Structure formats: structure tokens, C-alpha cells
């Protein structure tokens, strides 16, 4: 089944949105298979934002993501990558629709509450950066037969 990586960023953790965000994805019917509160190191941040290394805002990205704890998660379900992107809303909170996470809670592009993988390939790469294989739990949820 398809998996995606989501991360409540330091601003979302500090503003106490972890529970709200987890609840939204659970209510949608997705299955949480890995989660941890963690401090991102500069090394992990560099791997995570590798495609932005040469961009002028790279240092700010690393500084922000390492400024406080994050809540890293792996979710699975049919179409979870695209659906999660839609649930998060556009990157710029002022462009994000009401009802989306960023539309409801985001303040600025830099402090937009949540990160989510933008493709299956990105999800695989990001999951491998933040989680060891043994940290992911494969289990059956009885409600899946009512969803899929």
C-alpha cells in the first residue's frame, strides 16, 4: 500500500497542532504506521533539503527545521501522497483554501505548519531519512475493509 512522509514542523509543534493533524488523517481513513517526536540535526536537515542546497534560502530552511522538535510520521493508504498534499493545502498559507491545514493554521511560507512528500519517490527517500525500517509497524486495521 502507498506510503507518505509527513512532518509537523517546529511551529506546528510549538502551537500544539500535532493532535489536530493526526486526527484529520485518521478521520480520512489513513493508517499511521510510524511516528516520533524528534530534534532534526543539521545533517538530517541537509539530507532532507538536499535539492535546495544551492538556493539562497537553504540556510534559513535548515535553521528553522532544527530550531525545535518536529513530529515525523509515516501514513499509508490508497492515494495517500496526493490526498495528503490536498489536505495540507498550498505551500503559501495565504493561497491555501480554508479547511486545509495550512489554510486554517499557516501564517507564512516559512512557518506553514507541515511538510508532506510531493511524490511516491520523495516519500520513499524521506521515509528512509527519518525512519529505520524497524520503526515502521505493519498491522491490519479492521476499519480498512469499510474504506477500501
Curated annotation (Swiss-Prot):
EC top class, as a word: transferase
Main location: cytoplasm
Modified residues (Phosphoserine): 122
GO process terms (BP): CTP biosynthetic process; GTP biosynthetic process; UTP biosynthetic process
Reaction catalysed by this enzyme: a 2'-deoxyribonucleoside 5'-diphosphate + ATP = a 2'-deoxyribonucleoside 5'-triphosphate + ADP; a ribonucleoside 5'-diphosphate + ATP = a ribonucleoside 5'-triphosphate + ADP
Residue numbers binding ATP: 9, 57, 85, 91, 102, 112
Keyword list, A-Z: ATP-binding, Cytoplasm, Kinase, Magnesium, Metal-binding, Nucleotide metabolism, Nucleotide-binding, Phosphoprotein, Transferase
Catalytic residues (positions): 115 (pros-phosphohistidine intermediate)
Cofactor(s) for this UniProt protein: Mg(2+)
Enzyme Commission number(s): 2.7.4.6
GO MF entries: ATP binding; metal ion binding; nucleoside diphosphate kinase activity
CDD domains, A to Z: NDPk_I
Modified residues (Phosphothreonine): 91
UniProt xrefs under HAMAP family: NDP_kinase
Assembly notes: Homotetramer.
Matching NCBIfam families: PRK00668.1 (NF001908)
UniProt record similarity statement: Belongs to the NDK family.
Official protein name in the record: Nucleoside diphosphate kinase
Organism: Bacillus cereus (strain ATCC 10987 / NRS 248)
Amino acid at each position: 500500500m502507498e506510503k507518505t512522509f509527513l512532518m509537523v514542523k517546529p511551529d506546528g509543534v510549538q502551537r500544539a497542532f500535532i493532535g489536530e493533524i493526526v486526527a484529520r488523517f485518521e478521520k480520512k481513513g489513513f493508517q499511521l504506521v510510524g511516528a516520533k517526536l524528534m530534534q532534526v540535526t543539521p545533517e538530517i536537515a541537509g539530507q532532507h533539503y538536499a535539492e535546495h542546497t544551492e538556493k539562497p534560502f537553504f540556510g534559513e530552511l535548515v535553521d528553522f527545521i532544527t530550531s525545535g522538535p518536529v513530529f515525523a510520521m509515516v501514513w499509508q493508504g490508497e492515494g495517500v501522497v496526493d490526498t495528503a498534499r490536498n489536505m495540507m493545502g498550498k505551500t503559501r498559507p495565504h493561497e491555501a483554501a480554508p479547511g486545509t491545514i495550512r489554510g486554517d493554521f499557516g501564517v507564512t511560507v516559512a512557518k506553514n505548519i507541515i511538510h508532506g512528500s510531493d511524490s511516491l519517490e520523495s516519500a520513499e527517500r524521506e521515509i528512509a531519512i527519518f525512519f529505520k525500517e524497524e520503526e515502521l509497524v505493519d498491522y491490519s486495521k479492521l476499519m480498512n475493509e469499510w474504506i477500501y
